[in-house]
């Protein structure tokens, strides 16, 4: 939804199993390829140069004016002395310091309501599969407790405080379908002994951030909500990397939305200007 990035270091075992390899993985929502802010595209380039991630997952790739965003980015990063590999895509994207062996669509884009792609690399003898996901932005149900409609973002007469109603609205999106497509596809990759990573803008909070310890803050209105997508992934054995490092959601909320930019009007930065809609919706 808005330009935001989350950078984490993943540790993977190499083929010899006695050594460990650190990979810096970046999830980056680029807010319509940076076009929403003056010189935003070059801000994207600058951030990548500064952070120097090994693997990047992008959300909101648009290929405006028929220009491939990934190809343009690879060219401009090379001018800055950084070699990255990437293949053309839309909605979601992947860049890597390692040559991409293959890339394919896992969940196709339809009516701009989310998509998933995956790419495979070989790193020090290990095959790694990276999924880049930008999940459905409609029925954004975490706005309901804040008193805003999650499709129109208009203020409602009163907040929704019934968990079953919130989760029913959440399931009306395609987010759970998109995550189940990842899980089903990734099981086949794991059966082949490949390491699987997922990065994306989920447009949905983690259930780990909506338990008893946070029910009375951030306009959670006393509710514990087991949000679908994060629960599906954790039940299939995946780890929420930020929560692995920072397990306390009260002290370390890890908000990725909304973000602040002094050059942009507040109304363009947040969907609910009269509510506390801070959430962690970008994940690795």
Question: Which residue ranges define each predicted feature?
Answer:
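Short, solvent-exposed beta-strand-terminating loops
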Residues: 128-152, 199, 203-205, 243-251
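Structural recognition of the beta-strand scaffold that forms the well-ordered cores
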Residues: 24-27, 55-59, 86-87, 93-94, ...
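Sec-dependent signal peptide recognition
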Residues: 1-7
């Amino acid at each position: 939804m808005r330009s935001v990035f989350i950078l984490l270091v993943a540790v993977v075992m190499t083929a010899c199993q006695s050594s460990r390899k650190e990979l810096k993985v970046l999830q980056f929502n680029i807010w319509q390829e940076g076009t929403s802010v003056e010189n935003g595209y070059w801000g994207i380039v600058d951030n990548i140069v500064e952070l120097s991630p090994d693997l990047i997952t992008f959300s909101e790739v648009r290929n405006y004016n028929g220009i491939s965003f990934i190809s343009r980015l690879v060219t401009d990063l090379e001018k800055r002395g950084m070699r990255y590999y990437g293949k053309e895509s839309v909605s979601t994207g992947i860049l890597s310091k390692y040559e991409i062996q293959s890339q394919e669509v896992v969940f196709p884009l339809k009516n701009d309501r989310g998509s998933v792609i995956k790419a495979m690399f070989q790193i020090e003898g290990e095959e790694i599969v990276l999924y880049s996901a930008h999940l459905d932005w409609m029925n954004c149900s975490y706005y309901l407790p804040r008193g805003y409609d999650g499709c129109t973002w208009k203020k409602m007469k009163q907040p929704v405080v019934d968990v079953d109603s919130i989760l029913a609205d959440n399931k009306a999106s395609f987010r759970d379908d998109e995550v189940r497509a990842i899980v089903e596809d990734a099981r086949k990759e794991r059966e082949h002994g490949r390491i699987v990573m997922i990065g994306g803008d989920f447009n949905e909070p983690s259930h780990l951030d909506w338990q008893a310890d946070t029910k009375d803050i951030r306009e959670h209105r006393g509710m514990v909500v087991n949000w679908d997508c994060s629960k599906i992934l954790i039940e299939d054995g995946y780890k929420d990397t930020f929560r692995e490092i920072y397990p306390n959601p009260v002290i370390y909320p890890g908000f990725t939305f909304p973000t602040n930019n002094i050059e942009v009007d507040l109304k363009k930065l947040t969907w609910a200007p009269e509510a506390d809609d801070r959430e962690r919706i970008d994940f690795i």
